[in-house]
UniProtKB/Swiss-Prot annotation:
Protein name: Large ribosomal subunit protein uL4
One GO CC annotation: ribosome
Keywords of the record: Ribonucleoprotein, Ribosomal protein, RNA-binding, rRNA-binding
InterPro entries assigned to the protein according to its UniProt record, in alphabetical order: Ribosomal_uL4, Ribosomal_uL4-like, Ribosomal_uL4_dom_sf
The encoding gene: rplD
Ranges of compositional bias, category Basic residues: 63-76
Assembly and oligomerization: Part of the 50S ribosomal subunit.
Keyword Ribonucleoprotein: yes
Record GO biological process: translation
Family: Belongs to the universal ribosomal protein uL4 family.
Annotated HAMAP family: Ribosomal_uL4_B
Single GO molecular function: structural constituent of ribosome
Length: 209
């Protein structure tokens, strides 16, 4: 069972916390992580790219010139793919890029990423994270106390907290996420993850199933 330091919001170490082996100390499965992130990014695509075939391009209803006697190559329509402004052959069409991944595989990917973060000291645990009012200055001071200025930081919350969300949303590179919305891409796309002891317990409850 890995044991990591626990800090307060001023950056002082206030003790240690034991993390669950089956969530924060698993063998990192890079293949599964790649599979889940790729599927997630594919699902995020709009899939609206579209081109017109020769049957959809306007104009070109009649033969541009007679078949023989002009000295030019024979053509039957200006909508041919050979012409500038003609139809496109095998061009993109609107479609869904959704890739389905089993829930067990998604959870395995999340555990792998959290284990990687824990093993590489990219995970900071706070004894508590509460703000009475929404003020950006509070999060700026927190990041400064934890030596995280200028870094991409993901703050994981046990539940929705408007004060923390509003305090962090205007800071470049900082994102907040509740435990129920954890996903592989956001867990990977940062330099460090910050979460409270309460959030750790909530993560262990969700991912240990």
């Amino acid at each position: 069972m890995p044991q990591v330091a626990k800090y307060d919001t001023t950056g002082n170490r206030v003790g240690d916390i034991d993390l669950a082996d089956n969530v924060f100390n698993e063998e990192v499965n890079e293949h599964v992580v790649h599979q889940v992130v790729t599927a997630q990014l594919a699902t995020m695509r709009r899939g609206t790219a579209s081109t017109k075939t020769r049957g959809e391009v306007s104009g070109g209803g009649r033969k541009p010139w007679r078949q023989k006697g002009t000295g030019r190559a024979r053509h039957g329509s200006i909508r041919s793919p050979l012409w500038v402004g003609g139809g496109i052959v095998f061009g993109p069409r609107p479609r869904k890029h959704i890739k389905k991944v089993p829930k067990k595989v998604k959870k395995l990917a999340l555990r792998s990423i959290l284990s990687y973060k824990s093993q590489n000291e990219e995970l900071i645990i706070l004894d508590e994270l509460k703000f009475d009012t929404p003020k950006t200055k509070q999060v700026v001071e927190l990041l400064s106390n934890l030596n995280l200025e200028g870094k991409k930081v993901l703050i994981i919350l046990p539940d929705k907290d408007a004060n923390i969300y509003l305090s962090a949303r205007n800071i470049p590179g900082v994102k907040t996420l509740v435990v129920d919305a954890l996903n592989a891409f956001d867990l990977l796309n940062n330099d460090c993850i910050v979460m409270s002891e309460e959030a750790v317990k909530r993560v262990e409850e969700v991912l240990a199933r």
